[in-house]
Structures are given as structure tokens and as C-alpha cells.
Swiss-Prot record:
GO MF assignments: transmembrane transporter activity
UniProt-listed Pfam families: OpuAC
Source species of the chain: Halobacterium salinarum (strain ATCC 29341 / DSM 671 / R1)
Membrane topology of the entry: Peripheral membrane protein
Annotated GO biological process: chemotaxis
Keywords: Cell membrane, Chemotaxis, Membrane, Signal
Family from the record: Belongs to the OsmX family.
Principal cellular location given in the protein's record: membrane
Known function: Mediates chemotaxis towards compatible osmolytes. May function as a receptor that binds the osmolytes and transduces a signal to CosT. Has probably no additional role in transport.
Signal peptide (UniProt feature, chain positions): 1-29
Location of the protein in the cell: Cell membrane
A GO-annotated cellular component: ATP-binding cassette (ABC) transporter complex
Domain of life where this protein originates: Archaea
Record protein name field: Chemotactic signal transduction system substrate-binding protein CosB
Length: 334
């Protein structure tokens, strides 16, 4: 699961809540590898000095794939000996790991680092991704033995999506438009959301409050359309696709969103959720020019959310490492 932000009480404040994620790894050879005992090691090529680098990630699908993007870039462009610790754990585990040198390199999200890694912030009041990035980089590099590398231009945050059939002729393009629709006593759109999402601090009820949905209208809406709580965000997408619901909430780069036909992603026009752009994180002990250059390839290799979404879909079919290696090779990054 992705790390998620928390709702704020005013339109100018955005609060974040970091969630732990854990999971396994997929190891498919995309370069010269030696496997054994659960770890994968590789001796890369290129012109950096030889050193040992532990490559990590958090545990869910996109994070593991990004971990293997880092692994393949380092394996193919440096002389480092690599240790595969993709799927290492959630925020608490991986933040402890890079502070102690047990993980040297991985990609994380700005919102996760800001909210869930020491010193941890309960709020983020940034108008642009660059403002959040600058504050994050300054603080994290002064607090920890790491460097924050270049950020990508895309982000993986929550997305509100609605079936085209349900909004045809309404002009609904944004969450504010949806609020106006419901506040005008239109209850025709049935929402679906994952287990527990409605009451989360960054979930549906908080979103409705932030966007000033009239509480009486929301009560009437829920009574008339019976909000559908599903087992997961992906199941909510399936409910929309199969006509059991009209509106869902999921992750913006999830592979399953590509399988849902005829949906419209609504603009979070008041920035309820903050900026979750990926950035490279590297321990200062291994931050040579070659290592930094390799890891800074990611924003070019994955230039937009659509590319990440497609990569997630391929990873689900062929495995995280194979998908990462194929993508980098096919686009001449390794």
C-alpha cells in the first residue's frame, strides 16, 4: 500500500499520515546476478569505484519495482557490488535502515519522507512540489547521513475516479464540481471505497469535509445511494467497472486503474492530498558521482505517471525486476 496523507482542518493546511507497508520481493535476473540465502547480489559495470551498496524499497508493488529500477541502474552503470533488500519494510523499518547504514539506496515519496520519517511533520503547507522538495531536502540532509536526489515530475497519490456513464452531461471534472453536484441535492452517483477508508484521517469523510460537502446532503446521499465499502481500493475499481458503483478512490498509478474502462479521474483542485513525487535517497557513505548519476536517471526513465502505471501493469505480469530491467533496456537507459 502507498503511504498516505492526513486531512487538515483548513483549506491552506494539508496534514499527512504515514502508513507502514511490508511485503516480499520478486527476483528475476535482469543483469548478472548471484542469488543465495534470500539476498541477491550483483557486480555492476561502469566507471565508479568498487563498493558494496544495499538497495532497498518498501514492500508494496510499485515500491519494489522502483527498488529494482535503482538496482538495475546501479548494476549496469557502476562497479558497485549490490545487495538486494527490496521489499525491506515500511516507513519505520526503512528510515531506521538508512540512518544506520543497513540500506544505502532506494526511492521514496516526498510526502512519506516528510510525514513519517524523523523528525516527522503533522502538516505540510506547500503550494508547489518544488517548495516541498526544497524543505524536505534541506531538513533530511541536515538530520540524517543521506542525500535526497532529484525528484520525478509525477506522483503517486490518491485519485478519485468516476464512471463516464455517471457524469455524462454534468460537467463534473473536479472534486469541487462533485461537491456542487451533491450539494444541489443530486444523489445519483454511488461511491465505493476500500475497507476502513471512509473514516481514515485522510479518507472519504475528511475529503468531503475539506471540500465543503454539506453534511445534511452527504447524509441524504448515503441514505439514498448506500455507499459501498469493498475489501480494497482495487475492489472499489472493479465495482465501478462492473456497474455496482459509479465513483471510487484508488492510487493514481495503480496498474488496475488501466483495466477499468471509461473512467474519469477528478482533479483534486484544492490539493487535499499533498505532493508524493518520488525522490532518490542515498546514504552519504556511497554517494559517489557515479552512484548519484545512476540514481538520478529515474526521473528521465519514468517521465510521467502513465509510464509508471504501465510499468506497474507489466510488473504484475512478469515480475518486478524483469519489468524494471526490460523498461530500462528498451528505452536505452541501461
Amino acid at each position: 500500500m502507498m503511504d498516505t496523507p492526513e486531512h487538515a482542518s483548513t483549506s491552506s493546511r494539508r496534514q499527512l499520515l504515514g502508513m507502514l507497508a511490508a511485503g516480499g520481493t520478486t527476483a528475476v535476473a535482469g543483469c548478472t546476478t548471484i542469488t543465495g540465502g534470500g539476498d541477491t547480489t550483483s557486480t555492476g559495470g561502469g566507471d565508479s569505484g568498487s563498493s558494496s551498496i544495499v538497495v532497498g524499497s518498501k514492500g508494496y508493488g510499485e515500491q519494489v519495482t522502483l527498488g529494482y529500477v535503482a538496482y538495475e541502474l546501479l548494476a549496469n552503470t557502476t562497479n558497485a557490488t549490490l545487495v538486494d533488500e527490496t521489499g525491506f519494510g515500511g516507513n519505520a523499518a526503512i528510515s531506521e535502515a538508512y540512518r544506520t547504514g543497513n540500506v544505502h539506496a532506494y526511492y521514496d515519496y516526498m510526502g512519506s519522507l516528510w510525514s513519517s520519517h524523523p523528525p516527522k511533520h503533522d502538516s505540510a503547507d506547500f503550494d508547489t512540489p518544488d517548495a516541498q522538495y526544497d524543505a524536505l531536502k534541506s531538513e533530511m540532509e541536515s538530520e540524517h547521513p543521506i542525500r535526497i536526489l532529484d525528484r520525478a515530475d509525477w506522483q503517486n497519490t490518491w485519485a478519485v475516479f468516476v464512471a463516464e456513464r455517471a457524469v455524462e452531461g454534468t460537467g463534473i471534472q473536479s472534486i469541487s464540481d462533485l461537491a456542487a453536484h451533491v450539494n444541489s441535492r443530486n444523489y445519483d452517483i454511488r461511491p465505493a471505497f476500500g475497507d476502513g477508508f471512509r473514516s481514515r484521517s485522510d479518507g472519504l469523510d475528511a475529503l468531503l469535509d475539506y471540500y465543503e460537502f454539506d453534511p445534511e446532503r452527504v447524509t441524504a446521499w448515503a441514505s439514498e445511494r448506500e455507499f459501498l465499502e469493498t475489501a480494497s481500493a482495487q475492489a472499489a475499481g472493479t465495482a465501478v467497472d462492473e456497474g455496482y458503483a459509479d465513483l471510487g478512490v484508488g492510487y493514481s498509478t495503480s496498474a488496475w486503474l488501466t483495466d477499468v474502462d471509461s473512467v474519469r479521474v477528478l482533479d483534486d483542485d484544492r490539493n487535499f492530498w499533498p505532493f508524493f513525487h518520488p525522490v532518490g535517497v542515498v546514504h552519504e557513505d556511497v554517494a559517489t558521482d557515479a552512484v548519484v548519476a545512476a540514481l538520478n536517471t529515474m526521473p528521465d526513465a519514468i517521465p510521467d505517471a502513465e509510464t509508471m502505471q504501465a510499468l506497474n501493469s507489466r510488473a504484475a505480469a512478469s515480475g518486478n525486476q524483469q519489468a524494471a530491467a526490460d523498461h530500462l533496456q528498451n528505452n536505452d537507459f541501461i
